[in-house]
């Protein structure tokens, strides 16, 4: 297929190179080199390496951005010490421009260069194509261009007959349409075809002929899932994604592996619609540039990334405190902004004990799509610093902290572990060590950050229950139901309840909130039969049931996690056990559809 830009690309390359030389002419010069000479086909992985000459002494950091020629640049990785980037164009062919900016962090000297790179179609004639990727359970399906006003999706069928459809993509008659196929069993034969939705009455869906392909073998060492109680035959959300503290794994509800993630992330925080994932990556404790949040695609390739050191540059410019690391939460918000949790460390004197005490709090950070910090909220500004962690947790004793640097031990004061946006545009923040859920005035980015209410023992709500200890404690993954913003779902680890009453099981809770009168009424208080001392998740499923993950269970067989489906009466309908602890688990319709 002829490239729609024709010879323009060669002219643009000359102009681009000339511009780059002008930008870098002052002294420091950056050179960008690809691992493969262009052109390459859609989906081919290219490793870009930056070299710098003429720089004064000092550490050099690099920022990578890319764009399809004629469009705006999209951030891939913000400034960091990494001078290489694995990149591909997986959507369509064309001329792409890779940009790198280099800066000397000591002298502030900068250099910038760009490289024009041609990606060609995988289509020969008018026939679709199916090709493997670097991941044995991910394939690239390429379809010929389709007409304006139409859209396309791909359907693939497993050996036993299960069908999966990708999300639709909008057609552009200039370009082929390409899809990552994910959610595939290893060593299995599949059939696949694409479907064009023309939007015309009577002939809307037009399928292509089938292609056949066979998946690869598993090569990674993965954790396993074992069925404890089998689910019913007809059940919603048939994919289980387990966020291990290591390689994440997706299985069916029988434990059959259908995907696994990269090894360069510490844990997944959220799957995103369309088949991408957000994760936290914990690096060297003494290097904030290695403390990262990363969005990656089906093959594990980085789509978007920043790090604590780069964010601290922005926070300093705004007069905010520094962060030490990201933890527990990063997710895309409605409207495309990105929210993350990070640790803040301060020495407080005669506040949480006699003399100077190192105290760890949290910061909520909101980024725009280009990773610019646009809003922050700091527990040291808005919460009572004299209210210590409910069970007196310190970092050395509990060993659950991100890196800290100001003392040999620190009070793990808040230990935030989830953040979600409410229907009216505020934030719901979970503080494990305060045993509170806190509603923050975010107001879709226009809020001043004041605390609207605190839900939990000794907070702002009464609990309408006769239970001997109705309140959740050390809770995880609190979120409001999408269909009913007055119903709150959470996983109640129950640490404080267990410390107060003796041995207790963790619970899956659904609470009806009357925010006007500050009353919480239990709708579901399910005893899950195990005690999870940490970790956990909570989710409402499409069929109206709930999924709870007891992520940190200690027993004679070693650490494990239990993912359970529970009905509205608290009955456990199905249960599957992982042979490792899981930070969170997600019941998904498929790997493109989180719920």
Regions found by a protein language model. Give the residues of each.
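Acidic, Ser/Thr
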Residues: 49-55, 142-146
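Surface-exposed, short loops/turns at beta-strand junctions within beta-sandwich domains
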Residues: 88-95, 181-189
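Solvent-exposed loop segments of extracellular immunoglobulin-like
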Residues: 56-62
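Short beta-strand segments within Ig-like beta-sandwich modules, predominantly Fibronectin type-III
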Residues: 75-82, 168-174
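Histidine-/acidic-rich catalytic cores in large beta-rich domains
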Residues: 121-140, 145-156, 178, 185, ...
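Conserved aromatic beta-strand anchor motif in extracellular beta-sandwich/beta-rich domains
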Residues: 62-68, 154-158
């Amino acid at each position: 297929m002829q490239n729609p830009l024709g010879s323009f690309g060669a002219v643009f390359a000359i102009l681009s190179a000339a511009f780059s030389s002008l930008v870098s002419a002052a002294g420091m010069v950056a050179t960008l080199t690809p691992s493969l000479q262009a052109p390459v086909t859609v989906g081919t992985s290219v490793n870009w390496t930056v070299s710098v000459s003429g720089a004064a002494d000092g550490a050099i950091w690099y920022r990578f951005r890319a764009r399809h020629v004629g469009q705006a640049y999209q951030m891939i990785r913000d400034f960091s010490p990494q001078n290489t980037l694995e990149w591909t164009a997986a959507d369509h062919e064309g001329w792409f421009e890779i940009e790198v900016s280099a800066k000397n962090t000591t002298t502030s000297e900068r250099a910038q260069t760009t490289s024009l790179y041609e990606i060609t179609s995988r289509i020969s004639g008018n026939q679709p194509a199916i090709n493997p990727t670097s991941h044995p359970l991910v394939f690239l399906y390429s379809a010929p261009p389709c007409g304006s006003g139409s859209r396309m999706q791909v359907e693939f069928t497993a050996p036993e007959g299960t069908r999966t459809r990708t999300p639709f993509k909008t057609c552009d008659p200039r370009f082929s349409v390409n899809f990552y196929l994910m959610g595939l069993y290893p060593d299995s034969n599949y059939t696949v075809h694409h479907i064009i939705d023309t939007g015309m009455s009577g002939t809307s869906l037009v399928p292509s002929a089938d292609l056949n392909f066979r998946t690869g073998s598993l090569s990674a060492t993965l954790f396993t899932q074992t069925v404890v109680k089998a689910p019913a035959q007809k059940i919603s959300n048939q994919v289980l994604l387990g966020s291990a503290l290591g390689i994440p794994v997706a299985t069916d509800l029988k434990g059959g592996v259908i995907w696994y993630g990269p090894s360069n992330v510490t844990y997944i925080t959220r799957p995103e619609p369309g088949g991408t994932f957000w994760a936290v990556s914990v690096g060297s404790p003494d290097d904030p540039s290695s403390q990262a949040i990363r969005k990656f695609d089906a093959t594990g390739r980085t789509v978007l990334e920043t790090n604590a050191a780069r964010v601290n540059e922005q926070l300093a410019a705004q007069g905010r405190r520094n962060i030490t690391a990201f933890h527990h939460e990063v997710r895309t918000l409605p409207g495309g902004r990105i929210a993350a949790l990070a640790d803040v460390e301060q020495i407080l004197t005669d506040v949480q004990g006699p003399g100077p005490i190192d105290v760890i709090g949290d910061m909520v950070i909101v980024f725009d799509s280009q990773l610019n910090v646009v809003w922050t909220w700091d527990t040291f500004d808005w919460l009572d610093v004299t209210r210590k962690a409910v069970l007196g947790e310190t970092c050395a004793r509990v060993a659950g902290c991100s890196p800290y640097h100001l003392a040999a031990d620190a009070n793990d004061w808040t230990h935030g572990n989830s953040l979600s946006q409410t229907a009216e545009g505020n934030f719901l923040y979970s503080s494990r060590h305060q045993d509170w859920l806190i509603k923050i005035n975010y107001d879709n980015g226009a809020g001043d950050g004041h605390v609207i209410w605190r839900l939990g023992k000794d907070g702002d709500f009464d609990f309408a229950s006769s239970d001997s200890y109705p309140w959740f404690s050390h809770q995880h993954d609190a979120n409001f139901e999408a269909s009913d913003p007055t119903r709150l779902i959470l996983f109640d680890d129950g640490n404080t309840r267990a410390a107060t009453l003796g041995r207790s099981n963790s619970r899956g809770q659904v609470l009806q909130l009357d925010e006007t009168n500050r009353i919480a009424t239990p709708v579901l208080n399910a005893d899950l039969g195990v005690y999870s001392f940490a970790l956990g998740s909570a989710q409402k499923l499409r069929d109206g049931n709930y999924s709870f993950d007891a992520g940190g269970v200690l027993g004679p067989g070693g650490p494990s996690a239990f993912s359970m489906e529970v009905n509205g009466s608290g009955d456990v309908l199905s249960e599957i056990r992982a042979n490792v602890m899981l930070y969170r688990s997600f019941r998904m319709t498929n790997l493109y559809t989180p719920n």
